[in-house]
Amino acid sequence: MSLGLLIVLVIIVLAYVYGSTDHRETIRVAGRDWNVLSDYDNAAAAALLLERTHAKMIRFLAYLKDKYHVNETDEEIADCATHPHDTEQRRIVTALLDGYNPDVFYENRPGTNGTSYTINKGSAMYICLRNKINQNKLVDPDMLMYVMLHEASHIANYNGWGHEKRFWEVFKFILQNAVESGTYPPIDYSKRPEDYCGLHVNYNPYFDGALANIDM
């Protein structure tokens, strides 16, 4: 993707986001403020859902940091023969650790374009939390974790944009580690499709044997 096209796309997204009429409020849960839509009676429950998903992500990120020896000295890394200093896995994990920022998470309204999306590798993340038909019904926590890992993979995919093949390989790598860490239960959506904010989900790269693995 050319820089000019990328700039145009960012401008379009920002114009959509900041030109919308959505009103949000900040609700404090577990010492952190969450930006959720204010025109629902269960806004506090939405903030709690975000907090619980974030807590899973924090455990997952700590697992990745430890497994791939991020921010360790060269000497410490050298003592672990299975994970040398410069590997593709460490670059992916480092990009995710550097870019993940819950302070710029915002609830996104169901039925809007994109359902959930990330701007500029983590500058902002808009996350749909509600059923499209019954908007007082919050999404399933496991589905939300899958979506959060999807958005996290956009951050981790440090040298790519969009949903090209490389993104799906990175997403598979992230899912494999999330399952290994115990923070995400693998769900085969090809066998058990689910609705997410009006989007029909019928694919999980974790189960795609034709998709290349990034060695863990």
Task: Map each language-model feature to its residues.
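Metalloprotease/metallohydrolase-associated module, dominated by Zn2+-dependent proteases
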Residues: V8-V29, S38-V139, N159-M216
